[in-house]
A protein has these predicted regions:
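Function-critical acidic carboxylates
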Residues: 1-122, 130-198
Length: 198
């Protein structure tokens, strides 16, 4: 899509108390944080990371704790140029609390696509992103293990930044990771976040 920004379609979010996570993949990596139409401020978690195979492209993760919500809530990210391949993934954690741990890892093709581990001190929602590094040909698949459930994905062939997002609710303190299986064979950038009630 040719546009100076990319926005989610209007969604209904809780009026108060949610944690919003925004994971962004760009064909031309840029450091601009998301904005929204509810007046929230998104803070970057860690740093942006480029792909080994695509050194101009990369991903970044942002969060807003205790977010204000609304009907028709739209989150927007600026694009470094109008024709940039940009993918935006938004996850709302109702009554989310605080980001307890966040980890990133890049795994190249031929190795298990296992994320770095996050540690919680109690019950938490885990949110994982898979950003594959395959080229434009063929539709993709990305399937997580360890009881994670895919909640959204962009896996079609074509000039886009492919992504899958998955979640898992854990009931106790512990250390957790996730391994993805994908087709065609490829590497990926892997994010894993633990959001824990305050």
């Amino acid at each position: 899509m040719t546009s100076s920004s990319l926005s989610t379609s209007g969604i209904s979010t809780r009026t108060t108390g949610s944690t919003l996570l925004a994971c962004v993949g760009r064909g031309l990596l840029a450091g601009s944080a998301p904005t929204d139409n509810a007046g929230n401020a998104f803070v970057q978690l860690g740093v942006a990371h480029t792909y080994t195979l695509w050194p101009n492209s990369g991903t970044a993760l942002y969060a807003c704790e205790r977010a204000q919500g609304r009907v028709g809530h739209a989150v927007t990210v600026p694009k470094p140029k109008d024709t940039d391949e940009t993918t935006l993934s938004i996850v709302e954690i109702a009554n989310g609390g605080s980001v307890r741990d966040v980890q990133w890892r890049e795994v190249l093709s031929g190795n298990p696509l296992t994320s770095a581990s996050v540690t919680t001190t109690g019950p938490a929602l885990l949110v994982a992103w898979w950003w594959g590094d395959a080229g434009v040909d063929l539709d993709k698949t990305a399937v997580p293990d360890n009881d994670f459930t895919v909640i959204d994905s962009v896996l079609a062939s074509g000039a886009l930044v492919q992504c899958a997002a998955a979640t898992r609710q854990v009931s106790a303190a512990g250390t957790y990771n996730v391994t993805w299986t994908s087709t065609p064979p490829q590497g990926a950038q892997l994010w894993l976040v633990a959001v824990q009630a305050a």
